UniProtKB/Swiss-Prot annotation:
Functions as a chaperone protein. Is one of the most abundant endoplasmic reticulum (ER) proteins. Plays a role in the export of secreted proteins in the ER, the recognition of abnormally folded protein and their targeting to the ER associated-degradation (ERAD). Also serves as a cargo receptor for the export of transmembrane proteins. Plays a role in the assembly of the mitochondrial membrane respiratory chain NADH dehydrogenase (Complex I) by stimulating the translocation of NDUFS4 and NDUFB11 from the cytosol to the mitochondria via interaction with TOMM40. Residues 2-6, 65-102 are lumenal. This is B-cell receptor-associated protein 31. Cleaved by CASP8 and other caspases. Keywords: Apoptosis, Coiled coil, Deafness, Dystonia, Endoplasmic reticulum, ER-Golgi transport, Host-virus interaction, Intellectual disability, Membrane, Protein transport, Transmembrane, Transmembrane helix, Transport. The gene is BCAP31. GO terms for molecular function: MHC class I protein binding; protein-containing complex binding. Belongs to the BCAP29/BCAP31 family.
Length: 246
């Protein structure tokens, strides 16, 4: 394997490791959000867009080069005279195998680049929704406590007005308290609606993250299967060549 394909394969292994790390269930999105907001990660992200575009361009060029090599060595029977070159068939099969291997490596690297970027975005969105959900819940609890407090004060004022024998204008007090109660109830209902909307968004984000995790696990299994086929084909190619050299 040449130096450039060794670098691409190493990058692919690193991508698989990071995807598996992000899919670990016991690390919460909030903790990942703290990591993403750290100074080191923010420094990397500041140059990340340019690096990502350059990386995508390089991987696309490598995929195109691998496809070109596959088409070049695809039909060996029409390009090689097997009677005059008995060992050429094995040579062409080896070239074709390497081109296919390079296509798999570059293709999976390109796919995991988009998958990794999308997975990080979904985790950040999920952490933001969790924080918003907690904030709305606290606001709803605060509004509920305030409403209970005003209702208790309303009852106390009614009792005080009855004891004083009409010294207080009970009608005006009741009107004011009812208006305050209606206002508090409206605020409470608004907070409940916002909390329900946030919960729906959170469930949607969690479903998207779960789908991305399942997709990444499927890609990892497929890559492991291709590695096994790679090893088998490599052994099949190296065996006849070793015998030929002997």
């Amino acid at each position: 394997m040449s130096l450039q394909w060794t670098a691409v394969a190493t990058f692919l292994y690193a991508e698989v490791f990071v995807v598996l790390l992000l899919c670990i269930p016991f690390i919460s999105p909030k903790r990942w959000q703290k990591i993403f907001k750290s100074r080191l990660v923010e420094l990397l992200v500041s140059y990340g867009n340019t690096f990502f575009v350059v990386l995508i361009v390089i991987l696309v060029l490598l995929v195109i080069d691998a496809v070109r090599e596959i088409r070049k060595y695809d039909d060996v029977t029409e390009k090689v005279n097997l009677q005059n070159n008995p060992g050429a068939m094995e040579h062409f099969h080896m070239k074709l195998f390497r081109a296919q291997r390079n296509l798999y490596i570059a293709g999976f690297s390109l796919l995991l680049s988009f998958l990794l970027r999308r997975l990080v975005t979904l985790i950040s969105q999920q952490a933001t929704l969790l924080a918003s959900n907690e904030a709305f819940k606290k606001q709803a609890e605060s509004a509920s406590e305030a409403a209970k407090k005003y209702m208790e004060e309303n009852d106390q004022l009614k009792k005080g007005a009855a004891v004083d024998g009409g010294k207080l204008d009970v009608g005006n007090a009741e009107v004011k308290l009812e208006e305050e109660n209606r206002s508090l109830k409206a605020d409470l209902q608004k907070l409940k609606d916002e909390l329900a909307s946030t919960k729906q968004k959170l469930e949607k984000a969690e479903n998207q993250v779960l789908a991305m995790r399942k997709q990444s696990e499927g890609l990892t299994k497929e890559y492991d299967r291709l590695l096994e086929e790679h090893a088998k084909l490599q052994a099949a190619v190296d065996g006849p060549m070793d015998k030929k050299e002997e």
